[in-house]
Amino acid sequence: MSTRGKHLFYRDRKEWNDITPVPQDDNGRHIVNIAYSEAFVDAHDYFRAVLIKNELTERTFSLTSEILLMNPANYTAWEYRRRIIKEISSDLNAELRFVARLIEEYSKNYQLWHHRQWIVEELSKQIANGSCNSLTHLSSDELRFTDDVISDDPKNYHAWQHRRWIVSFFKISVEEELAFTERMLLSDVHNNSAWNHRFYVVMLDEGLSPSVLTREIDFVQKRISFAPNNESSWNYFYGLLVPFVHNRKYIYSETSKPSDEKSSSNETDFMPKLQLMLKFVEDLMAVDRTVVDCLAPLSFVVEVYTDYLKLHFMKQSNGGGTLGKQDSPHVDASTGDSLNITYDPKTIFDRAISLCDRLANEVDRIRASYWQYRARQLMCFTKNFNLPCDIIIS
């Protein structure tokens, strides 16, 4: 009998005598033969045969287990296995354990995480009309599982994506996830995955009410003070700005759900926050002179200047006049000298162009073309509103 150690080939198993194996068809055009093991060839020949027959039985379920242990990335095998599971009503909890063992070894495999999500969805359907405690137990188990994987690999994209799905699917409490991200960022403030997860929790699950905005500004500023050149935290900081300039749907009042309506007061209401953000950069530069040459905060200031000008001209074009002096912040981030708040949009425009020039020629020369493009973009934008500009981009 053909065996290798304890392995019994399918061709030698009596219960498979009714199946004619289907060998792999390479059309005779292969340049280099892949050195498949004999067991691999044997199992896949039988797999192709039952797949053609669409046999959904216990033995084909066992066959897919062996196929997937040989190659966990075999999407066809996973899809076939799901059809078998539904047909034979296989134990989904056992299936969770099976895929968990594979994830322990292959944690960055797309097919494994997709299959796990499918299992959780099917399990939730089974217990939908049963005990709420069972559903809570399932969600807790999934959070704990992703926590374990992330603890081993804090930037595992697949685990973070699965956790994001779990939070949305089970409507996990915002407080629980904020605490989780805070713990992860305490461990590594540069963990962009943790910042990204927190952003989605705040924007999609909680909503950016005035009190939430204040809390998150305080949260991110403390992390920036600890690591001023951390691009992830500056991106998060800027992300808090984006809804007010580009997309209203994430903005909540304290008592209402988000709305797509554009409120003429949004821009003005946000200006004190914008001023505080820029004042924070000013103070940071005054305390730590190295920040003046850091790419991340300087890039942040360019974005804030740009968005300020957009808000200013949006209000002007809507017939609301110009933003008043009390609403119009300016920080001279191009020099790092003692900074004064000024109010003239033309001055802000000039400083933005000057900062783009400094980034292109001193701080971020490898992306000089990008910063030159940003300067030209600003000039084209302001020309549409008849803002005079006599700056030549170098």
Residue ranges and their predicted role:
Residues 97-228:
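Eukaryote-skewed repeat-based solenoidal scaffolds used as protein-protein interaction platforms
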Residues 48-51, 64-72, 85, 100-107, ...:
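A conserved position within tetratricopeptide repeats
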Residues 38-40, 52-57, 88-93, 134-140, ...:
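Helix-turn-helix repeat elements of alpha-solenoid scaffolds
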Residues 199, 203-394:
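Structured C-terminal portions of repeat-based eukaryotic scaffold domains
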Residues 96, 149-151, 251-252, 292:
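Eukaryotic gene-expression regulator signature that favors modular helical reader/repeat domains
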Residues 55-58, 72-75, 107-110, 154, ...:
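Residue signature of alpha-solenoid helical repeat architecture, marking inter-repeat boundaries
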Residues 1-73, 85, 91-92:
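Extreme N-terminal leader/anchor segments
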Residues 45, 54-126, 161-162, 166, ...:
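Non-catalytic amphipathic alpha-helical adaptor/oligomerization segments
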